Amino acid sequence: SVMDAAFAAKRAALTVDLLVQNLSPHSNRGSEGAVPTKLYTNTEGIRGSERIPCGADGYLKEEAVEEAKRCIQCHCDECMKSCVYLSEYKKYPGLLAREIYNNTQIIMGDHQMNKPMNSCSLCGQCTVTCPNGFDMSQVCKSARENMVSTDKMPLAPHEFALMDMLFSNSDAFLCKPQPGYETCRYVFFPGCQAGAIAPDVVMDAYEDLCARVEGGVGLILGCCGAISEWAGRYEMTEKVNEQLKQELAKLGDPVIIAGCPSCMKQLKENTGAEVRGIWEILKEIGLPGKARGLEMPVAIHDACGARGDTRTQDTIRELLTAMGCTVEDTEYSRDLSPCCGYGGLTAYANKEMAAKMTEKCLERSDAPYITYCMACRDRFAREGRESRHILELLYGDNACNMPDISEKRYNRLVLKEKLLKNIWNEELMMEKKDYTVAYTEDAIRMMDERMILKSDVEHVLADYRESQEAVFDEETK
């Protein structure tokens, strides 16, 4: 064949080169002929073709062109096919990893790879799709930690998310045993996004667990620390871990019932406690009385936090089937499921990239989406797609309109207030204002896009009312 001829010519050329140098023609030849390769090439959908016969004098020009066309240009882009992050930057992981590493070594000057390293959702999909298991998420996560520890990473890309985590673990934080118990066998940890987006679901779920689970079920409202870990802020994560360990000790170190797969993963790795998903508990004790499935086929979006967790993936599908849902698995589901755009704080560091990630998720099916991560449900609903968190189906509640960033904080406080009042007969005195602020729809939309809280605006106005000092903009009067 022509390849054999080309190999023979190269082999002969190497022999001549060695002889000219007065070296043995048998030395320093390296690997010759066919050798194993680590390069993976997906040949699915590629049809074989007949080799063009080669005459004794070689190919004619036209024959050579036709034979060359049979080459499929072997390359591996399995991770780039499904990962928006890699496909948008149009760089293979090896090259991107090198550039990110070089970025961490810059002492003075522009760190131009900060945005790319902060745009990865840290979901781990690339590791599953890569035939060699290359983990781009670990590269980006380690780089963030390195940049933070050496004071090279600006706070700006993740500041709002980190402040929101601190709010969840301070003003909106709550840790209580079930009434009638000093310590509990279990504690429900719904996660900060559930309380912000669907507070009624959290309340109904907790009341149901208290009524049907033996041994007492405590409650912790707060953040698991995934936010600071994604941001590479190791010290903040350690403070969250210590806070949660202390609160769990007060409850008698109970088994944690997590309402979020990311929380479940984070708490398992950092608290030393036994952690189970609420879906596992409900499978054991039976569906709540208000559980209702959708009458139409539904598409499941598997959460990043459940990647590699076959038990959780199966349990979710079993619960949906038990509710009468017709479950549809999409092309990229289970361990291959893409990130919704919230993971890794992509939604804060690179909104355009996050929007494309959400779009990538939604293009897999036209059916309503069922999630078991509240952040996924929030992002899909914001794009106008009908979606439900599985707990909304299980407890007959629907978050309806997706709250903006200010409403999410307010929802957490209201949830805490209602739980204290209805479950523990305690009053929480929320701050009362003697005035109201009217916002136009455009203002609310712009504030949400720019991550400006209503409370920030009200603090500015309160300061003005006290000091009577302000800057007047002639153009917007």
Task: Identify the residue ranges that each predicted region occupies.
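Short coil/turn segments at secondary-structure boundaries
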Residues: 78-86, 155-159, 474
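Cofactor-cradling patches in redox/metallo enzymes
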Residues: 193-279, 305-321, 328-418
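Conserved beta-strand elements of the Class I
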Residues: 187-188, 299, 370
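Extended, hydrophobic interaction surfaces within ordered domains
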Residues: 1-34, 63, 112-148, 240, ...
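Iron-sulfur (Fe-S) cluster-binding segments and ferredoxin-like electron-carrier domains
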Residues: 38-55, 81-100, 128-146, 230-235, ...
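Ribonuclease/tRNase effector modules and their secretory precursors
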Residues: 400, 404-477
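Ferredoxin-type iron-sulfur electron-transfer modules and their immediate structural context
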Residues: 1-119
